[in-house]
């Protein structure tokens, strides 16, 4: 087999990563996109294997193997409830975090519309599962108020309160932004909602497993989470619904999940999400400290060594593993491809919207100009990442950013170094 060039993706059988050009040695993959998804932890894998290798009973069946499957579901539910300081009867499993978001928004809207409440409040930089649910409701006659965050990416309770109307049914504000990592004052926002007898939901998909989340302390009515964000498999999520709150069912059919969410339970996924969240919360302080150390190293070094690089979002109240940085004069897609050729996985924003070349709605909402937003990169760290990987990322950025800027008309013009030519080829 011909020896591949350094930094080139190996297409040869048996090699699935990158090669360093020396005897076909695979280059280590540096995965820095943990906000998009995370690798399964050993506890989750063990739970999946136990569920799949065991009896294949349906949890709703009234015989021994059905009871065994139900025990796995009950254990997973109890683990999730304990991690959130909720009661097991307040945890309802879904197929993903987006399903939980849809359930909270649409289920509340349809439930309370009969009372004449057809107004909802959310933020302008929510995940698209919330924004698209709100847009659907607007198309059928509901009204939605979108609260803009400040320039650092924070929602202020007084702005939310100013948008409340007598017919407001729901306030939904995310706990931590999926692109810039800013953590919102959920306890204060929930208190504002309850002062006006309004239900409050938070999309905590990026928060659960990354920072402490206590539903009783926060005072939320509904909360969405997704297993693959904290080292469980994809395809399993959950919603916390406080006792006394009853949004309309999103899926109708059988009597699963206390007749709240139809469909045979994903036993292996439920076992895994419980095991993964238990593991994440048991080691949470150490995990947060480790991720924040890597995050701060990258932010400090990049802002120091790369001209005009800027951090997007406030630094103090921020997810410990999130660094979203703009590199003016470049397109994020260009940086992304260069990083990929060096074995580094990162993103230009939310993986759920990565096919779009439009500037991030999150960055636009905090007032970033489109040209700056186009050059933004998101690096998100997990417990498996190392300081060596953080150093390698910075080394790579310090090599590719100046090189790409030297070829960028946008950057050269901003620096006053570009020579502009007319269509006839004459230098202006």
PLM region descriptions:
Residues 3-5, 24:
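Polybasic, lysine-rich low-complexity intrinsically disordered segments
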């Amino acid at each position: 087999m011909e020896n591949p060039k350094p930094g080139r993706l190996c297409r040869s059988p048996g090699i699935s990563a990158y090669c360093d050009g020396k005897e076909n040695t695979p280059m280590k993959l540096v995965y820095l996109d943990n906000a998009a998804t995370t690798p399964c932890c050993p506890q989750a894998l063990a739970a999946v294997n136990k569920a799949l290798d065991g009896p294949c009973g349906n949890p709703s069946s009234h015989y021994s193997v059905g009871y065994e499957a139900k025990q796995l579901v009950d254990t997973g539910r109890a683990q999730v409830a304990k991690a959130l300081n909720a009661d097991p009867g307040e945890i309802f499993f879904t197929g993903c975090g987006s399903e939980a978001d849809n359930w909270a928004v649409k289920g509340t809207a349809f439930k309370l519309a009969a009372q004449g409440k057809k107004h909802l409040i959310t933020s302008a930089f929510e995940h698209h599962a919330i924004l698209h649910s709100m847009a659907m409701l607007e198309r059928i006659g509901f009204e939605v108020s979108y609260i803009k965050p400040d320039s650092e990416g924070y929602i202020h309770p007084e702005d939310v309160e100013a948008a409340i109307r007598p017919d407001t049914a729901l306030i939904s504000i995310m706990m931590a932004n999926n692109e810039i990592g800013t953590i919102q004052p959920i306890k204060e926002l929930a208190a504002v909602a309850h002062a006006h007898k309004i239900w409050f939901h938070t999309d905590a998909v990026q928060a659960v497993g990354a920072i402490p989340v206590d539903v009783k302390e926060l005072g939320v009515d509904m909360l969405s989470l997704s297993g693959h964000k904290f080292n469980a498999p994809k395809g399993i999520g959950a919603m916390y619904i406080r006792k006394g709150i009853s949004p309309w069912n999103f899926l109708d059919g059988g009597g699963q999940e206390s007749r709240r969410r139809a469909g045979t339970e994903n036993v292996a996924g439920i076992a895994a999400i419980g095991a993964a969240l238990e593991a994440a919360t048991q080691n949470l302080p150490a995990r947060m400290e480790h991720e924040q150390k890597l995050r701060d190293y990258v932010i400090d070094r990049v802002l120091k060594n790369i001209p005009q690089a800027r951090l997007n979002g406030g630094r103090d109240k921020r997810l410990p593993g999130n660094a979203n940085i703009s590199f003016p004069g470049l397109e994020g897609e260009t940086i992304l491809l260069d990083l990929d050729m060096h074995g580094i996985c990162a993103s230009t924003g939310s993986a759920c919207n990565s096919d779009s070349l439009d500037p991030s709605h999150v960055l636009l909402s905090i007032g970033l100009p489109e040209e700056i937003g186009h050059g933004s990169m998101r690096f998100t760290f997990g417990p498996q990442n190392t300081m060596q990987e953080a150093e390698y990322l910075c080394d790579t950025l310090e090599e590719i950013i100046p090189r790409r800027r030297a070829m960028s008309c946008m950057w050269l013009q901003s620096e006053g170094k570009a020579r502009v030519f007319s269509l006839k080829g004459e230098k202006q």
